[in-house]
């Protein structure tokens, strides 16, 4: 009885957890439905707003088409007025051209007279052009002298640096010479001291032959070193003399260059003085030329005045009628002047109106381009919506395939479950048919141990299933999306069925092991204790997982059917909206093509 109560307590929390899972799945499905409904409402409101915007745009386009017609009428009237005004202006231009031709003839006569005067001036100026040529040649020479002076300055700087380096070398060599001379003097003093010592110790030579041999070697070495030092001193003296000669040569060259620079500077100063004197002469000559030119102009004006007087005196008698005629023309022009001013004001107003019309037309074109851009954007959004709908359809198809596979797996698990149940009932019947006398010789300690181990295994598996359900419950709140909850529930049901099957197989194996008798020492037992675990096993098996999986599959199928219906409705709405947009764009394009054709005509 205790085992039965334990197994029923292990089964009831599993069923409760499965019911909680089903409730959570229903809540998820309802939340998804609410989200879909909200999205559908938002899309419908957006579509309504877009339809209203399109209707407003159509009304604006119609109004602007009417305005364009009115503007065309105004343009026709303005063109007629412009034709009349152009004819009037052409007549005035012809009169002005006649007057201009007269003025050109007079100007040509004056130009010929001035050309004659200019020729005489050119002959005088040809003699004066020789002086600028000489100035240019002098300027070139000055530039050449300046370039040479720059080169000499650079060479002088180089020579100075070379002299500085030579002085430094000379100082170093002089120091080395002094050192060598000091060393030579030291060696000579040492040699003199060594020569005096052997003279003093001449009677003691036979005793010190062996001792004097290393002293002789040292003296030879010292002599060799002295010879080397003398040769080095001679070489240094020669190099010093050479450097002194080079320094003297360089100093002489520097003096020569300095003299040349001084001579060049003197020549440049002379050339500058000559240039200044020539500039003064040129200025005086230019002043005289300007004075003569002014006098010639005055003489020409006097001659023209005299010629005009002669002509006026000659033409005074026959030309008395012409001033009267000109006066009449002037009076007519003065009387017509206000009319011309009015016409000009009208033309200005018409031009301003035309500019306003052009600006309005440009604004209309900009608005039309903006509307076309908006239509293009709407088409793009519709295309994106269609792509999303296609993706949703694919996802739904994939989910349906997954669910079909899960249903097939559930059917297979149901079949296995039924087979295990039949085997279980068969084994129970076999256990009931056995004689109780046989069980007296069976090792009940082994049987009870195997049954307890199987029960403990089942309890451990039940606890593990509970922990897995708790983990799934925690993960479902955070990461389950769309239809993953269905897949998790189906996988869990499938695992629980497989585990129950394995538990049934283990129980059947324990029963078969118990059927084999063992000749060990018999133990006293009661029949109730033997039948109680079997009854407990019989109560553990019917956990009814097929009913739960069937409910989940029905809910999933119902949800998928609703999703398919909504997707189809969305497709229909989008198709109708796309057709309306295409019709509207075709209508607007036809309208504006007709307007453009009429403008070209």
Curated annotation (Swiss-Prot):
Known function: Key structural component of the deuterosome, a structure that promotes de novo centriole amplification in multiciliated cells. Deuterosome-mediated centriole amplification occurs in terminally differentiated multiciliated cells and can generate more than 100 centrioles. Probably sufficient for the specification and formation of the deuterosome inner core. Interacts with CEP152 and recruits PLK4 to activate centriole biogenesis.
Species this protein is from: Rattus norvegicus (Rat)
Record flagged with keyword Coiled coil: yes
Parts forming coiled coils: 14-59, 86-197, 226-278, 340-397, 555-586
Cellular component terms (Gene Ontology): centriole; cytoplasm; deuterosome
Domain of life: Eukaryota
Residues that bear Phosphoserine: 544
GO-annotated molecular function: identical protein binding
Stretches with biased composition (Basic and acidic residues): 121-131
Quaternary structure, from the entry: Interacts with CEP152; the interaction is mutually exclusive with CEP63.
Protein name: Deuterosome assembly protein 1
Subcellular location: Cytoplasm
Biological-process GO terms, alphabetical: cell projection organization; centriole replication; de novo centriole assembly involved in multi-ciliated epithelial cell differentiation; multi-ciliated epithelial cell differentiation
Keywords: Cilium biogenesis/degradation, Coiled coil, Cytoplasm, Phosphoprotein
Sequence segments annotated as region (Disordered): 115-135, 188-213, 307-326
